[in-house]
């Protein structure tokens, strides 16, 4: 497996938090915090894929690389595929890691951990999850659960993803973290697939891969990154990063 390429899709079209990637956190745009943490993961080059000049300029001002993509992609995965062909047309990177642009507090170590399952040639896509500890999250449809069985130390093979409380019975529930490491061929196959029945019902893009028979494995991690979707999330991220700077 070659060094992975980390791509961070970012655009301004958030409905609950307008101009989200450029939101100020500790004097810097949120997208810069995400980019910096991806660089600190130390697993490969990092590129931001965007359709917005201001986002590209923010990254380039820090010495980073950004590429411009089309504004009308149906999903982040399609933006990822376009960016991959722009950045690496010769196919030097056979793994691409998709880090969401709204995770300013993410631990670089879990970005690095995301590629671990791809050492197994049977795995098409790798991702992350964490044990749910807060009871209210177990029934929260905004907390996506991964259903799977253990295939190694701190690793699950995904059988399903759902917004419902699942699986039934005693044992932990796992919160899916929306960070993906794709084999390049798997990403190309994925974006060419039609939308799946379960994907439409649950509104979860990753179900398309499972419906097509692709294998997704997840590493179980301790740290659950804060996804910034609302003004309240943004204030929490500002507080968390301010505390980290003091320490």
Swiss-Prot record:
What family is it from? Belongs to the KdsB family.
Functional description taken from the UniProt entry: Activates KDO (a required 8-carbon sugar) for incorporation into bacterial lipopolysaccharide in Gram-negative bacteria.
Q: In which pathway does it act?
A: Nucleotide-sugar biosynthesis; CMP-3-deoxy-D-manno-octulosonate biosynthesis; CMP-3-deoxy-D-manno-octulosonate from 3-deoxy-D-manno-octulosonate and CTP: step 1/1; Bacterial outer membrane biogenesis; lipopolysaccharide biosynthesis
Extract the Pfam families matched here: CTP_transf_3
- Protein name (Swiss-Prot/TrEMBL): 3-deoxy-manno-octulosonate cytidylyltransferase
Gene Ontology terms: biological process: CMP-keto-3-deoxy-D-manno-octulosonic acid biosynthetic process; lipopolysaccharide biosynthetic process
Q: Which InterPro entries match?
A: Cytidylyl_trans, KdsB, Nucleotide-diphossugar_trans
Q: Which CDD domains match?
A: CMP-KDO-Synthetase (cd02517)
Record-level Gene Ontology MF annotations: 3-deoxy-manno-octulosonate cytidylyltransferase activity
Q: Which domain of life is it from?
A: Bacteria
Q: Where in the cell is it found?
A: Cytoplasm
């Amino acid at each position: 497996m070659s060094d992975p390429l980390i791509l961070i899709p970012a655009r301004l079209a958030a409905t609950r938090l307008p101009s989200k990637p450029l939101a100020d956190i500790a004097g810097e745009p949120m997208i810069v915090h995400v980019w910096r943490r991806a660089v600190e993961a130390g697993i490969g080059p990092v590129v931001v894929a965007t359709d917005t000049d201001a986002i590209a300029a923010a990254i380039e001002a820090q010495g980073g690389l950004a590429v411009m993509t089309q504004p009308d992609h149906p999903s982040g995965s399609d933006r990822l595929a376009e960016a991959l062909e722009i950045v690496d047309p010769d196919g030097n990177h056979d793994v691409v890691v998709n880090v969401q642009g709204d995770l300013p507090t993410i631990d670089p170590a879990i970005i690095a951990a995301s590629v671990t399952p791809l050492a197994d040639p049977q795995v098409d896509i790798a991702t992350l999850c964490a044990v749910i500890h807060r009871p209210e999250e177990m029934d929260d449809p905004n907390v996506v659960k991964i259903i799977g069985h253990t295939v190694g130390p701190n690793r699950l093979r995904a059988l399903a993803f759902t917004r419902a409380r699942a699986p039934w019975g005693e044992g932990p529930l796992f919160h899916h973290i929306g960070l993906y490491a794709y084999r390049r061929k798997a990403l190309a196959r994925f974006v060419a697939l039609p939308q799946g029945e379960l994907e439409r019902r649950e509104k979860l893009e990753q179900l398309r891969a499972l419906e097509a028979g692709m294998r997704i494995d997840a590493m179980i991690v301790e740290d659950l990154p804060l996804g910034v979707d609302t003004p309240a999330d943004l204030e929490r991220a500002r507080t968390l990063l301010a505390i980290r700077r003091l320490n």
